[in-house]
């Protein structure tokens, strides 16, 4: 959607499908962050993002279960493109050499947008089970936001440094061709 999401026009199925896409995209992004940043032990950025990805997977499963029980195999009308108004950062924001700080900032931004999605959707969702699920997910987004704010506040200055390509040598002459 190129304009702001109009919640009044969403069906219950659309809301569930958007929620599912939000969680799937977040999981994939957090796995990408974890892979890019690496894991050196409990509590480092890679481990935090792996844990967040696991949490998003659980959210996906809860939403999928609810959707299946209500709508069966009915085809979704929303697509991955529709979530960029809701949670996902711009595609260019996620880079291979992202700094720890930037990764956490993007995660915070995404979690804040996810909170806003669930919070606003609650004004339109009337089905009791889905309303309860969205309230639970909104509350979890609040926890994620609070956690990320604390992590960011305690990051060392070095967290601002972007990753470097260890194979890159600025003193090695460039080659025009790799032919022998």
Segments predicted by a language model, with ranges:
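Non-heme di-metal
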Residues: 1-180
């Amino acid at each position: 959607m190129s304009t702001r999401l109009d919640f009044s026009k969403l069906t219950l199925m659309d809301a569930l499908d958007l929620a599912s896409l939000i969680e799937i995209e977040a999981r994939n992004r957090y796995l990408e962050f974890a892979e890019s940043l690496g894991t050196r032990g409990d509590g480092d950025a890679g481990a935090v993002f792996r844990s967040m990805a696991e949490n998003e997977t659980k959210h996906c499963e809860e939403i999928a279960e609810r959707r299946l029980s209500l709508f069966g195999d009915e085809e979704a009308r929303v697509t991955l493109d529709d979530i960029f108004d809701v949670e996902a950062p711009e595609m260019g924001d996620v880079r291979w050499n992202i700094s720890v700080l930037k990764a956490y900032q993007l995660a915070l931004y995404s979690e804040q947008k996810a909170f806003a999605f669930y919070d606003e959707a609650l004004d339109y969702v009337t089905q009791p089970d889905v309303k309860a699920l969205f309230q639970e997910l909104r509350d979890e987004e609040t926890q994620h936001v609070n956690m990320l704010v604390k992590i960011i506040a305690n990051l060392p200055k070095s967290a601002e440094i972007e990753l470097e390509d260890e194979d890159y040598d600025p003193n090695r002459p460039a080659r025009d061709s790799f032919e022998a």
